[in-house]
Amino acid sequence: MARTPGWESEYREYVATRRRPLMRTAYGPIPDAQFAQAQDWQSAYTTSVGDVLVMMGHAEELGGWRCRDCDEEKVAGGTLYRQDYSTDAGATWWFTISFVRDDGSFVNVLESVGAPDQQGARDQRHVSDAQMAALARDPRLTF
C-alpha cells in the first residue's frame, strides 16, 4: 500500500493552523470571528488518487450516530466504525473510519480513491485503516 511521506506531520500542522469551522445552518465556512458557534470542523486534502476528508462535530450535528452496515469496535472512550463503499457504481471508493465518543461527539476520516473496482482502490490507498483510526482518535480533535 502506498503511503504519502510526512502525511501525519502535515495533518498536525493543518489542525493547528488552518481549520475552518462550518455551521449546520450555513453552507460553507463561517467568519473566523464566529468560530465558537461552529458545530463541526472539516479539512480536506487532495492526494494523487483521490481525497482525504476529516470531519469532527458535536453530537447534535448528526442527531445521533447512525451507520448501517458498519463494522463496529468498542475502544477506550467510544466506538470505532469502519465502512468501505462506492456511491457512483464503483468509479470512486470511500474508505471510512469514524470514532464516536461516549458523549456522542464524533470524528470521521474518509479517503476516496478513483479505481475501477474495490480491490484496485484498496491497493492505491495513501492512508491505512490503522492511520485513519489513530487520526480519528487524536485527542486534539475535539471542541
Regions inferred by a protein language model and the residue ranges of each:
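Intrinsically disordered, low-complexity prosegments and terminal tails associated
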Residues: M1-F143
